[in-house]
Amino acid sequence: MGQKVNPIGLRLGINRNWESRWFPTKANLVENIGEDYKIRAFLKRKLYYAGISQILVERTAKKLRVTVVAARPGIIIGKKGSDVDNLRKELQDLIGKDVNINIKEERKAGASAQLAAESVATQLEKRIAFRRAMKKVIQGAQKAGAKGIKVSVSGRLGGAEMARTEWYLEGRVPLHTLRAKIDYGFAEARTTYGNIGVKVWIFKGEVLHKGMQPEKTEESAPAKKPRRTRRGK
């Protein structure tokens, strides 16, 4: 099951929080979902080169707050915050409501699965070899402190006539372990041969509650002592 479903959705309420945080009623449920989709689609298209790793939408009775977590927040803020003001006005025109925008910096950009997937996609669009792009992202994640990373690319790799899937795995990525903190990202590279899908899973460690023991692996298991030979009578 862990191999098939989205690892973020599988862990909601366990070690992952929702990215849309509000309580709906029957009257505004569809409207709120549509607004969240428009906000995310607009920001990802408008601020693609700022390296957005996460967009949080929070609603209260009268307020709508959007938090953008980006690797390069200076691109969004601009000189003296002028770009943020323009962005706020564009969002207000889009959904017809007052919006507060907060910009946060992604301190560990190398350990963000979404940024890693977008990095591979950008390199593929620049005609860099897919194996080289995958290995570069893996090295960056390991330097950022990731305990494991898996990168998968699917499509007409290298211009081949038949589409295929290639993937690399470094370290551990336990998709079936619900207490494992796993980040997931997806991006598409639009090449002359067609679209290439990029998926990235990054394992950041286990979230242990009181009384829980970490999962033992083959590397961490203690070595068995050699048996003593019995002496003859």
From Swiss-Prot:
Disordered: annotated segments: 212-233
CDD domains (UniProt xref): KH-II_30S_S3 (cd02412)
Domain KH type-2 intervals: 39-107
Comp. bias regions, Basic and acidic residues: 212-222
CC terms in the record's Gene Ontology section: cytosolic small ribosomal subunit
Keywords: Ribonucleoprotein, Ribosomal protein, RNA-binding, rRNA-binding
Start-end of Basic residues biased regions: 224-233
InterPro entries (alphabetical): KH_dom, KH_dom-like_a/b, KH_dom_type_2, KH_sf_prok-type, Ribosomal_S3_C_sf, Ribosomal_uS3_bac-typ, Ribosomal_uS3_C, Ribosomal_uS3_CS
Family according to the record: Belongs to the universal ribosomal protein uS3 family.
Self-association state and partner proteins as the record states: Part of the 30S ribosomal subunit. Forms a tight complex with proteins S10 and S14.
Role: Binds the lower part of the 30S subunit head. Binds mRNA in the 70S ribosome, positioning it for translation.
Name the UniProt record assigns to this protein: Small ribosomal subunit protein uS3
Organism of derivation: Campylobacter jejuni subsp. jejuni serotype O:2 (strain ATCC 700819 / NCTC 11168)
Source lineage: Bacteria, Pseudomonadati, Campylobacterota, Epsilonproteobacteria, Campylobacterales
